[in-house]
């Protein structure tokens, strides 16, 4: 198998692109390991961020529709709450009257007819609680966090939702729909909970997949293949990797586009997907 260079980083960037080499240090691979955090950002127009009292009242009035309750409420001017959902604790930060949470960078936007100007919005963050922060990548934590964020996005005047580990921003109803479908057993929502970034050579690299599968993925491009078809294939592979979990040895899989070779890096943090000749 001829392994042509498909990385999005230029060959003279000082990074070793050999899949058999040790993984680069964090920050060396710009696309694969730049994901900033494990929170969900809920963005509001100025003056519309909720207070701790408003969140507590919303949960009390939901009659179980939002499966969460307040377990710790400091003074309201501290601007945060601890919530319990499915036996797991989460923190909601950036509430009024405290300062808004940091918004972060955005690499992809989904679901908007016309996206808002992010610099005009204010964020609150839904984060894994301190007691479970070390397990932020465990499926029960991610699924509960995503479901709770979807409920809040529909019940509050949210203007946009950010999935921090992928640096994506979504229209609230779009976010809620893809999360609900996924939690009901549907395909993993790669267009939102990960970013799929296209290289000049037609390859596609993920950002944020490592939270779900332990590694980022890069799919080799194919000459003459329409970009939409490459994207569909990348979505299939991401769904497979999320369902399969960590891949530690090379393997081949069958797809509608033919057989593919999955080759993990030596450290397991990067997965190359090749198209055997």
Predicted feature locations:
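Internal, hydrophobic cores of structured domains that mediate oligomerization or house catalytic pockets
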Residues: 88-190
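Aromatic/basic-lined ligand-recognition segments
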Residues: 164-255, 261-277
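Cationic, low-complexity basic patches in intrinsically disordered or flexible, solvent-exposed regions
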Residues: 3
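Short acidic, S/G/P-rich loop/turn micro-motifs used as interaction or catalytic elements
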Residues: 49-50, 131-135, 225-227
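Short, extreme N-terminal segment that most often corresponds to the first beta-strand
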Residues: 14-72, 86, 270-277
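N-terminal low-complexity, intrinsically disordered segments
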Residues: 46-117
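Structural alpha-beta junctions
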Residues: 61-69, 146-161, 240-249
């Amino acid at each position: 198998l001829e392994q042509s260079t498909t990385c999005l980083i230029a060959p003279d960037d000082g990074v070793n692109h050999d899949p058999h080499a040790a993984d680069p240090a964090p920050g060396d691979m710009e696309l694969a390991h730049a994901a900033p955090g494990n929170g969900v950002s809920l963005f509001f127009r100025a003056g519309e961020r909720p207070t701790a009292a408003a969140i507590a009242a919303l949960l009390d009035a939901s009659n179980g529709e939002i499966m969460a309750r307040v377990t710790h409420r400091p003074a309201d001017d501290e601007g945060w709450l601890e919530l319990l959902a499915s036996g797991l604790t989460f923190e909601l930060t950036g509430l009024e009257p405290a300062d808004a949470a940091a918004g972060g960078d955005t690499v992809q936007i989904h679901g908007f007819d016309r996206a808002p100007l992010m610099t005009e919005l204010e964020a609150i963050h839904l984060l894994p609680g301190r007691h479970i922060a070390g397990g932020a990548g465990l499926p029960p934590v991610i699924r509960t966090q995503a479901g709770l964020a979807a409920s809040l996005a529909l019940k509050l005047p949210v203007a946009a939702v950010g999935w921090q580990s992928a640096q994506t921003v979504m229209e609230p109803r779009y976010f809620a729909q893809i999360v609900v479908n996924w939690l009901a057993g549907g395909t993993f929502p790669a267009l939102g909970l990960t970013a799929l970034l296209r290289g000049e050579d037609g390859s596609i690299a993920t950002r944020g997949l490592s939270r779900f599968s332990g590694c980022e993925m890069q799919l080799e491009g194919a000459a003459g293949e329409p970009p939409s078809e490459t994207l569909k294939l990348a979505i299939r592979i991401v769904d497979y990797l999320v369902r399969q979990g960590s891949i530690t040895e090379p393997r081949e899989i069958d797809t509608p586009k033919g057989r593919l070779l999955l080759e993990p890096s030596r450290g397991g943090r990067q997965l190359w997907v090749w198209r055997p000749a």
